[in-house]
Structures are given as structure tokens and as C-alpha cells.
């Protein structure tokens, strides 16, 4: 879940509230091809490169906890455990808003290298 943990998050978010998307109550403000920002889904089958790709770091508005680029910019590897299949979360520019929902996960084979999966260097907030 995307839970706001800042003591004074400002007017867009409420401390302690769980949000369905990393951008808040809606996917508005994320970087994805079709239904982010409330645009109707479209067919991209005629576009060979599937869109413009990931947005530059920090170019989307900050979301829950003031973090940038958490919504649909690139899938993030979230599982480094044993086994061939590894978990990803957060969606990417290649997919629509439904893939960035807090309950959505995908798996990819270990060693997958594609333009819509990345990683995030992170530190515990405590």
C-alpha cells in the first residue's frame, strides 16, 4: 500500500492515509501511455516503439510521501529472493494506470532487461 508517512504532507495528502496509487487517489500525474491523466485508452499497435519511454527523473509531480516517479514511469524490481521469477511493482509508461495500483504485481524471469523495468535506490525513512 502507498501510505502517506510525512508528518505534514501538505494539502494533497493526509498523514496515515493509504492511497490506491503512488500518485494518490487517482493515477493523475503519472507517466504512462493510455489512461493516466484520465485520457481514454487508445490502441498503440501502430506505434513500433510503444510511446515516448520513461520520463526524466523528477519530471512528474511528487506523489505519496513526496516521492517522484513512483507512478508508471518504470516497473521496479521488488523481489531479490530465490527462484527464476522476480516480482515487479508500480507499472510503467508501457502500461495503463491499472498496473500501478497498489495491489498489482507482475513477475518477470530473472535476468530480464527491457526499457520499461528499472530499480530504485532507497533508504528507510526512519
Tell where the protein language model's regions lie, with residue ranges:
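Short, structured beta-strand segments at or near domain termini in extracellular proteins/domains
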Residues: 116-126
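Conserved catalytic-core segment of clan PA serine endopeptidases
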Residues: 112
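Functional-site microenvironments in short loops/helix caps that host divalent-cation chemistry
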Residues: 1-106, 115
Amino acid at each position: 500500500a502507498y501510505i502517506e508517512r510525512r508528518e505534514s504532507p501538505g494539502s494533497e495528502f493526509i498523514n496515515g492515509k493509504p492511497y490506491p496509487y503512488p500518485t494518490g487517489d487517482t493515477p493523475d500525474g503519472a507517466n504512462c501511455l493510455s489512461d493516466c491523466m484520465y485520457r481514454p485508452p487508445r490502441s498503440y499497435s501502430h506505434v513500433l516503439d510503444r510511446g515516448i519511454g520513461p520520463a526524466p527523473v523528477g519530471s512528474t509531480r511528487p506523489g505519496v510521501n513526496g516521492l517522484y516517479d513512483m507512478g508508471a514511469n518504470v516497473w521496479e524490481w521488488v523481489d531479490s529472493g530465490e527462484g527464476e521469477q522476480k516480482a515487479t511493482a508500480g507499472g510503467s509508461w508501457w502500461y495503463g494506470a491499472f498496473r500501478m495500483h497498489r495491489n498489482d504485481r507482475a513477475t518477470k524471469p530473472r535476468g530480464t532487461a527491457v526499457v520499461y523495468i528499472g530499480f530504485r535506490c532507497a533508504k528507510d525513512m526512519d
